[in-house]
């Protein structure tokens, strides 16, 4: 294996590792941002796309698990801090930390509940962005 093949292998490796930058450029690197969409627009996309629609719907429903986990975690750890510490700054910090931990645990529960590990979450979001861009531009075929 020569140096040229080695360099090409390294380029391919890092191109794969930084492929998420294409997503961020498409979503955030715009001269003129896309207008806000509503829940009705998202529901229209879910109904119109048989592949990515159900995936996007499951991802939207999984937010409830993260929110529930954040509420439970924040209330639990904040309550324990209030019971034993009674220091206001400790209660605030414990509530915040409990909410973060609860949201992470809730997200993991949702990941398995909806089997999101089998889906292409970035692809579904990007497909929705493409669809919304076409709809805003007036190129929607439905």
UniProtKB/Swiss-Prot annotation:
Record has Membrane as a keyword: yes
Any one cellular component term from GO for this entry?
A: mitochondrial inner membrane
Pathway listed for it is: Carbohydrate metabolism; tricarboxylic acid cycle
Against InterPro entries, the record matches this protein to: Gly_zipper_2TM_dom, SDH6
Membrane topology, as annotated, equals: Peripheral membrane protein
Which Pfam family is an annotated match for this chain, by its short name? Answer: Rick_17kDa_Anti
Instruction: Give the keywords, sorted.
Output: Membrane, Mitochondrion, Mitochondrion inner membrane, Tricarboxylic acid cycle
GO BP annotations of the record are:
tricarboxylic acid cycle
Entry's localization field? Mitochondrion inner membrane
Superkingdom, natural source: Eukaryota
User: What subunit structure does UniProt give?
Assistant: Component of complex II composed of eight subunits in plants: four classical SDH subunits SDH1, SDH2, SDH3 and SDH4 (a flavoprotein (FP), an iron-sulfur protein (IP), and a cytochrome b composed of a large and a small subunit.), as well as four subunits unknown in mitochondria from bacteria and heterotrophic eukaryotes.
Q: What is this protein called?
A: Succinate dehydrogenase subunit 6, mitochondrial
Phylogenetic lineage = Eukaryota, Viridiplantae, Streptophyta, Embryophyta, Tracheophyta
